[in-house]
UniProtKB/Swiss-Prot annotation:
Residues 26-129 form the HIT domain. Hydrolyzes adenosine 5'-monophosphoramidate substrates such as AMP-morpholidate, AMP-N-alanine methyl ester, AMP-alpha-acetyl lysine methyl ester and AMP-NH2. Plays a role in the regulation of kinase KIN28 function. Essential for growth on galactose media at elevated temperatures. Induction: Expression is increased in response to DNA replication stress. Expression is regulated by ZAP1 during zinc-deficiency via changes in transcription start sites. Expression is also down-regulated during unfolded protein response (UPR). GO terms for cellular component: cytoplasm; nucleus. Signal peptide: none annotated. The gene is HNT1. The lineage of its organism: Eukaryota, Fungi, Dikarya, Ascomycota, Saccharomycotina. Homodimer. Interacts with KIN28. Present with 5410 molecules/cell in log phase SD medium. One of its GO terms (molecular function) is nucleotide binding. This is Adenosine 5'-monophosphoramidase HNT1. Its cofactor is Mg(2+). Its EC number is 3.-.-.-. The active site is at residue 116. AMP binds at residues 51-52, 103, 109-111, 116-118.
Amino acid sequence: MEPLISAPYLTTTKMSAPATLDAACIFCKIIKSEIPSFKLIETKYSYAFLDIQPTAEGHALIIPKYHGAKLHDIPDEFLTDAMPIAKRLAKAMKLDTYNVLQNNGKIAHQEVDHVHFHLIPKRDEKSGLIVGWPAQETDFDKLGKLHKELLAKLEGSD
């Protein structure tokens, strides 16, 4: 199979640890070095690389080496590994302002069905992630009821 992108600076080394992957997933193919990437950091549980369709210079993706479409599908040890990598990348890029973004599901703007975290530098008002959503008026009675319901559900969960 011919690589999608070919350049001498792309990484195609074998991954550092076995993982639960999906043969059809583009991110799993990157982890397995079937597709080259601009790899930045690789650990036993995670793989970080530069996004090839960046929102800003330095836009990176951090992906668990475990295939799962949604955050709740991923074992904790893989999730625990991701944020220190985001921190390390932000420090390496000397970022004072940035976004860490993670979407779950198509209508939540997830484009690849493999959990991933975006580290998006925000160097000025026009570059990087531009977010705007309508804030709702707070109904404190409704919010209090939701709070109690969630606490009850959390009591019986991990």
